[in-house]
Regions:
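A short, structured loop/turn motif at beta-sheet edges
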Residues: 15-19, 68-72, 90-95
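Glycine-rich portal/gate segments that line the openings of hydrophobic small-molecule binding cavities
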Residues: 13, 32-36, 40-83, 99, ...
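A general secondary-structure signal for short beta-strands and their flanking turns/coil
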Residues: 3-7, 51, 84, 93
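Hydrophobic ligand-binding cavity/cleft-lining segments
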Residues: 1-45
């Protein structure tokens, strides 16, 4: 694998319920709405389950994801191809934590930061009452 070893752990506060955070991370239909510009392959199940393998692309870079752990407050993805490593998510009422480690030519810390900001914005918009 070409690239450098990178690792990053970030935790943010979000004005959202644990259930909304969980749905945003474990349901591919929700994940695709906020994790732009990353594109996921078609035909994903309603919810990420252990043992599932899927791919995403970020421009010309393809990333393979293997769902190692999928629990009510934790998601662990083993990554290969464009990133050789793992991505862990933990969450609770009002907070999300992301830990990313891997070898890649991509700037993982920057991507992780942008993803968390996008998730927070998505959750804020989702929780605005419709009039």
């Amino acid at each position: 694998m070409l690239g450098t070893f990178q690792h990053s752990s970030l935790r943010i506060e979000v004005n959202a319920k644990e259930a909304d955070i969980r749905d945003s991370l474990l349901r591919p239909s929700q994940l695709q709405k906020w994790l732009w510009p990353q594109q996921f392959n078609q035909g994903l199940p309603e919810q990420l389950q252990p043992g599932l393998t899927f791919t995403s692309s970020l421009g010309p870079v393809t990333i393979q994801h293997y769902v190692d752990v999928s629990q009510p407050n934790c998601l662990r993805l083993l990554l290969s191809q464009g990133i050789d490593g793992f991505h862990e998510w933990y969450w609770g009422e009002g907070w999300v934590q992301s830990r990313l480690e891997g070898i890649s030519i991509l700037p993982l810390n920057l991507g992780q930061t942008i993803s968390l900001i996008q998730l927070r914005e998505f959750l804020v918009k989702k929780n605005i009452p419709q009039t």
